[in-house]
Swiss-Prot record:
It holds the Pfam family dUTPase. GO terms for molecular function: dUTP diphosphatase activity; magnesium ion binding. InterPro entries: dUTPase, dUTPase-like, dUTPase-like_sf, dUTPase_trimeric. This is Deoxyuridine 5'-triphosphate nucleotidohydrolase. The gene is dut. It comes from Gluconobacter oxydans (strain 621H). PANTHER family: DEOXYURIDINE 5'-TRIPHOSPHATE NUCLEOTIDOHYDROLASE. This enzyme is involved in nucleotide metabolism: it produces dUMP, the immediate precursor of thymidine nucleotides and it decreases the intracellular concentration of dUTP so that uracil cannot be incorporated into DNA.
Length: 151
């Protein structure tokens, strides 16, 4: 993957000391992994939601967001997902990045210090301007939704 790198400033909170910064696992990866900055193992019961700290704070450049997404391996093997996926970190947020994690599996799952718990994808943001009109253009689909175009 050939692309220009975008600088994102990052600071560590004390509970993330000793953990590596988020990193891309391969040269072609779109997402980088966030690590759990927990001091003690955290067990997530089936159906439970928890907030997992990363110990990191960032400053995104203007017109970007950071999308937080589940890791496919955790989802497939353990049912670990992010209920608000993708989560959005706005460019003006400066607090600790904490990940809302849910165990949709059937067995408890334990998050250890350094567990790769989620992935982040940097994305450009376009802002819209609403234009209120009396009617909308007609389309072949019209008002069909929720399965109206097939299964």
């Amino acid at each position: 993957m050939t692309t220009d790198l975008i600088d994102v400033r990052i600071t560590r909170l004390p509970h993330s000391e000793g953990l590596p910064l988020p990193a891309y696992a391969t040269a072609g990866a779109a997402g980088f992994d966030f690590l759990a900055a927990v001091d003690a193992p955290m067990t997530i019961a089936p159906g439970e939601r928890v907030l997992v700290p990363t110990g990191l704070c960032i400053a995104l450049p203007p017109a970007y967001e950071l999308q937080v997404r589940p890791r496919s391996g955790l989802a497939l093997k353990h049912g670990i997902t992010l209920p608000n996926s993708p989560g959005t970190i706005d460019e003006d947020y400066r607090g600790e990045l904490r990940i809302i994690v849910m165990n949709a599996g059937t067995e408890p799952f334990t998050v250890e210090r350094g567990t790769r718990i989620a992935q982040g994808v940097l994305a450009p943001v376009s802002r819209l301007r609403w234009t209120e009109v009396e009617t909308l253009d007609e389309t072949a689909r019209g008002e069909g939704g929720f399965g109206s175009t097939g299964h």
